[in-house]
């Protein structure tokens, strides 16, 4: 059985999220007379990861920790010149006191963002870049705030790519585990298929400030790429969150709370138009006002 851990300072974390939520994401005054081309859907490809199977380490339940799970959604809606315009939202879930403790769920957004276009980058690449920025910004805001107790866990959807040595040093000093869990990642199928039943992990690389692993969080759970600054944090995760089909429930809740509705997407386009942008096609007024029974994110 895991040991009891101090509870998260929920009001302090809530104030951080609320402050992040109120930050100005886009100076809409600069849109006047800008001609925006409204975008259609397009699926992107995840980053490639090669699994080098090594020794498989079994996981047992560890320390009961307070955890924060962060996920986001971003939808490209328009472009002009060399800029993408996206609407995004983030979900933040706090769980303290063990796997079955009631979660606190917060939502950031929806907000508009302007992202400079990189050479060869498509709209889904821009959306991934924005999601990484939003989730990473919230993660680092919480990490550097001092609002966390020892042995806290911060979970984000996706990898920990871009994490600096300074951030890792702060996490180690605060005894906080940063954990990135990728739902979709290109791996060698035969290698992932041969991953033993969990819970456990095999290290792919451990030469930076965080380890990259191929892991199962329950016996027959879906194999995942999991990045972590502290491998012991994976044991704490098993004691601190419900694992559903091999995936942490708190991250699942964060994902659902970040999903953007079609009416929110249409409202974002309306906001662009209200600030002087010339759209390439007229908006559907009924959908903008009422929405339809469909979600994206």
Question: What is each residue range found by the language model?
Answer:
Residues 74-113:
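Acidic, metal-ligating active-site segments
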Residues 1-60, 65, 117-297:
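Long, contiguous domain-sized segments
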Residues 65-75:
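Two-metal-ion RNase H-like nuclease active-site motif
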């Amino acid at each position: 059985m895991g040991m009891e851990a101090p509870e998260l300072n929920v009001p302090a974390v809530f104030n951080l999220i609320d402050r992040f939520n109120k930050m100005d994401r886009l100076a809409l005054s600069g849109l006047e007379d800008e001609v925006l081309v409204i975008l259609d859907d397009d699926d992107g490809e995840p980053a490639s990861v090669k699994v080098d199977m090594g020794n498989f380490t079994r996981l047992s339940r560890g320390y009961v920790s307070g955890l924060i799970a962060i996920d986001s959604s971003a939808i490209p809606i328009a472009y002009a010149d060399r800029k993408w315009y996206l609407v995004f939202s983030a979900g933040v879930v706090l769980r303290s006191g063990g796997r079955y403790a009631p979660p606190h769920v917060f939502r950031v957004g929806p907000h508009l963002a302007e992202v400079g276009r990189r050479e060869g980058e498509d709209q889904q690449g821009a959306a991934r870049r924005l999601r990484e920025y939003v989730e990473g910004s919230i993660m680092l805001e919480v990490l550097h705030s001092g609002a966390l107790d020892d042995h806290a866990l911060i979970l984000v959807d996706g990898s920990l790519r871009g994490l600096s040595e300074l951030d890792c040093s702060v996490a180690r000093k605060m005894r906080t585990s940063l954990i990135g869990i990728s739902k979709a990642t290109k791996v060698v199928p035969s290698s992932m298929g041969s991953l033993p039943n969990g819970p456990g992990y095999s290290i792919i690389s451990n030469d930076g400030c965080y380890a990259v692993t191929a892991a199962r969080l329950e016996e027959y759970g879906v194999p995942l790429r999991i990045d972590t600054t502290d491998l012991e944090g994976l044991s704490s995760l098993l004691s601190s969150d419900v694992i559903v089909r091999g995936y942490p429930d708190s991250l699942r809740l964060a994902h659902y709370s970040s999903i953007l509705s079609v009416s929110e997407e249409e409202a974002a386009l309306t906001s662009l138009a209200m600030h002087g942008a010339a759209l390439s096609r007229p908006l559907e007024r009924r959908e903008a006002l009422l929405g339809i029974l469909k979600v994206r994110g």
